[in-house]
Amino acid sequence: MNNKVHKLSIIGATGRMGQMLVRAAQEKKDFQLVGLLEENGHDLIGTKASELFPSLEKNLVISDSLDKILKISDVVIDFTNPENSVKVAEEAAKYKVVDVIGTTGFSKSQIKKIQNVSKNTTIIRAGNMSLGVNILTGISAKVAEALDSDFDIEIVEMHHNKKVDAPSGTALMLGDSIAKTKGKKLDNLKDIQRDGIIGPRKKGKIGFSVIRGGDIVGNHSVIFAGPGEQIIIKHNATDRMIFARWALKAAKWGMTAEKGEYSMQDVLNLN
């Protein structure tokens, strides 16, 4: 049992997910918040954290120095943007700091950079941190494996109107798990752009549909449509705190893991 109190810093601490992570960390006795990072030029740089989060220590301030924060941290959690998350991963690796990444929308080259620096530290990167979605991922792969090519596969995802990437990292994670059961890469199977007269659906493709609106936290459905029947598996998130709490579980798991890149499937022992 790992009962050590780990020094934790939150990257993008004043953002939507950053604030959730700060609140979730305060629920945990095995983490001590030592750093709250924001980007250079942010209006809140230098602000006492207790002004935003009254229960935090009064000497903790919002910082823009990644270097200073990494020097005092055991682990960082980052839900920001791809470019920033790559930079954080590269710097965290230099300090051997565990890095939990919940950012989505990475390019192939950015993923490669993260994989390369994971040789020097533990990195946990997931398109979705929740238990339910990761179970959905495993179930979807098993269903896909059991069905023949008569079943068309569609993934439908819904998110709030502020989300900037599409399809969501979760939808791509679901598609990737299904593609692997077929011994193929998702890039060769995914069908995203549909507009106009496109002809009949191509056999074996994995279709993606994207919905953006309101304050939807995150809904994902995997549809297996065959002749005369459909199998629909879905997960709805109603509270962002689930992502924060499971990110903290990933952070604790990462403290005893070997160097390398891991997913939530590893953290939850679902592989």
Stretch-by-stretch model annotation:
Residues E39, T104-F106, N128-M129, M158-H160:
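Short, ordered loop/turn segments at secondary-structure junctions
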Residues I135-D150, A166:
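Rossmann-like NAD(P)H-binding beta-loop-alpha module
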Residues N3-L8:
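Extreme N-terminal starter segment of soluble prokaryotic enzymes
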Residues V76-I77:
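N-terminal Rossmann-like NAD(P) cofactor-binding module of classical short-chain dehydrogenase/reductase
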Residues L21, V88, I114, V143, ...:
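Aromatic/hydrophobic pocket-lining residues that form π-stacking "cages" and hydrophobic walls in ligand
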Residues V86-Y95, G102-I123, N134:
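Rossmann-fold NAD(P)-binding glycine/threonine-rich loop
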Residues S73:
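An anion/phosphate-binding loop that grips the pyrophosphate of nucleotide cofactors and donors
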Residues I11-L70, S149-N271:
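C-terminal substrate-binding/catalytic lobe of Rossmann-fold NAD(P)-dependent oxidoreductases
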